[in-house]
Design a protein with these regions (language model features):
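Generic alpha-helical transmembrane segments of integral inner-membrane proteins
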Residues: 2-10, 36-40, 60, 78-90, ...
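Single transmembrane alpha-helix segments in multi-pass membrane proteins
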Residues: 3-14, 18-73, 93-100
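Hydrophobic alpha-helical transmembrane segments
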Residues: 27, 35, 56-57, 74-82, ...
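A generic hydrophobic-helix recognition signal that picks specific residues
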Residues: 42-44, 81, 141
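Alpha-helical transmembrane segments within multi-pass membrane transporters and channels
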Residues: 72-110
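Transmembrane helix-bundle core of multi-pass membrane transporters
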Residues: 98, 102-166
């Protein structure tokens, strides 16, 4: 890790653009997207399972949130989250009750979730009409964070607390 910081410092040498608040903000935005997905995969790997359905769930939850959240973004986000919970619950019950491999069950889940997304969208790109939601979620605060990255950090903190005290 120290070596990587030294190399990055040499790359930045005097320009001042690489090690900047803007770069940290950009990295945090990327973390806000990929961090929770990686956390879910990592937690499943801790219990010697592997969840291949994550990418299918991300696309389905996003589509559900966009398709149902035009009038009320909170409702869309809640329904997208609920879809993820229901999907995970179904796959978890199948694995535990039928004693099946997580790879097989979640691969089937991935294909099923992608199929549902395909049907919901008609294989078309869906867009969200209200850009003020995106602007609000991505607006910087404290020069380093956005609402999205703060939520991702909170999810990591919650996972750490659950792992520590359960």
């Amino acid at each position: 890790m120290v070596g990587a910081v030294i190399v990055l410092g040499l790359i930045d040498r005097g320009s001042g653009y690489f090690f900047s608040l803007g770069t940290v903000f950009s990295v945090m935005q990327l973390f806000a997207t990929l961090g929770p997905v990686a956390l879910g995969l990592g937690l499943s790997m801790l219990v010697r399972k592997f969840d291949l359905s994550v990418s299918g769930m991300v696309s389905l939850a996003g589509c559900i949130a966009v398709l149902t959240g035009a009038a009320n973004p909170w409702l869309g986000a809640l329904l997208g989250l609920a879809a993820g919970v229901v999907s995970g619950l179904i796959q978890g019950v199948i694995m535990t009750r039928l004693n099946l491999s997580s790879v097989g069950v979640t691969l089937g889940g991935l294909l099923t979730l992608q199929g549902i997304t395909y049907v919901l969208t008609g294989n078309q790109t869906v867009s969200y009409p209200d850009m003020t939601v995106a602007l609000g979620l991505n607006a910087p605060f404290a020069h380093l964070f956005s609402v999205r990255s703060a939520v991702a950090l909170a999810v990591f903190l919650l996972a750490a607390l659950l792992m520590r005290y359960t």
